[in-house]
Amino acid sequence: MNYTQQLKQKDSEYVWHPFTQMGVYSKEEAIIIEKGKGSYLYDTNGNKYLDGYASLWVNVHGHNNKYLNKVIKKQLNKIAHSTLLGSSNIPSIELAEKLIEITPSNLRKVFYSDTGSASVEIAIKMAYQYWKNIDREKYAKKNKFITLNHGYHGDTIGAVSVGGIKTFHKIFKDLIFENIQVESPSFYRSNYDTENEMMTAILTNIEQILIERNDEIAGFILEPLIQGATGLFVHPKGFLKEVEKLCKKYDVLLICDEVAVGFGRTGKMFACNHEDVQPDIMCLGKAITGGYLPLAATLTSKKIYNAFLSDSHGVNTFFHGHTYTGNQIVCTVALENIRLYEKRKLLSHIETTSSTLEKQLHALKRHRNVGDVRGRGLMFGVELVTDKDSKTPLEIEKVERIVRNCKENGLMIRNLENVITFVPVLSMSNKEVKTMVRIFKKAVHNILDRKC
């Protein structure tokens, strides 16, 4: 038994993988990644793969980036960690200042955590307590959130409560709190004749809910522009701005979950920037450290922050925090990550590669099994169907065979049900983007076009 075989045996014996049916996984030939460089991952057998899912939508400047490596090593020579509870540290202060500089101008305070789910959990608790701190009696019933159907905000209980993907969430229905779910503005599978008709109907319904149940609603949480985990649903232009207007009109806090779509993924630094939206609370994660280490942040306004201030420790205090909140190493690499965006003019690069990806993928719409191609920036989904008229989702077995065929030919991508997602390393070159699509196109041909 060679080294790779030994590792696979131990992996199967000891490791429980996330969002994975282990009964299936244990029977498959697992790929064990040993190292990475640039847009590529390398396994223990020496095979290399284009990272077409940015190691779960997080990698920015490529793997094994010398600049990010350098700042981590430099910080390690100073200190690895000290608590942010009752004291502070240099990297957490400098990163907070930078985050305030690059996010919407109304956001003035940064609360750190370690995962996107945690940043959402914090946002929910922050919004809920905000109303209680202002006037507990007047806002006694403000404990619900408007959410979008098919939304995904993480896997902790609060985040699941504001989610809307049955596959992930239905098993926990007895544990979660009630939310007010509204229709997602996703046109491809809607029953509307036009996007405008769909958007008008959904916004009208949202406004009616805000009028009728205003005393219950603490906030409106959504993934701005693109709903990721449900299959990359892209919202119509103007939807986010209209939601912001309604939230302001009816005095409801707007929470934008930018964990997946933030840091250039949609072509602008943040998805909110596309429509000049200023949320009351913004959640950040994933790409915040360039794909190196776990860090998240929940940003909010002075108005909300001030509601938590008191001269007495036990009054209005936000009792939330994690052991490694504001850790020096992760804050250091996050700060360097943001500096590299600016130094390398990454948003301009994404504008070019995004155009290439969009053109390459839209060319596939001629295929009889490609029902829809949707996305923005470097975040696209290809929905596979049995035929274009019925829009019946392609059998999952065939979709998974396409994904496996891509891996066999040197491309790591993943599917969300019948949607193949393309969320590559943000610094991926134009040539690599074309290679990624070419491998996928070949896989589609191998699985769907060849007669057995």
Curated annotation (Swiss-Prot):
Q: Which domain of life is it from?
A: Bacteria
What biological processes does GO assign it? biotin biosynthetic process
The UniProt entry's sequence similarity note says: Belongs to the class-III pyridoxal-phosphate-dependent aminotransferase family. BioA subfamily.
Which PROSITE patterns does this UniProt record tie to the protein? AA_TRANSFER_CLASS_3 (PS00600)
What protein name is recorded for this chain?
Adenosylmethionine-8-amino-7-oxononanoate aminotransferase
GO molecular function, a single term: adenosylmethionine-8-amino-7-oxononanoate transaminase activity
Q: Annotated pathway, please?
A: Cofactor biosynthesis; biotin biosynthesis; 7,8-diaminononanoate from 8-amino-7-oxononanoate (SAM route): step 1/1
Residues binding pyridoxal 5'-phosphate, per UniProt: G116, S117, D257
EC number from the UniProt entry: 2.6.1.62
Fill in the subunit field for this protein: Homodimer.
* Feature type site, description Participates in the substrate recognition with KAPA and in a stacking interaction with the adenine ring of SAM: F19
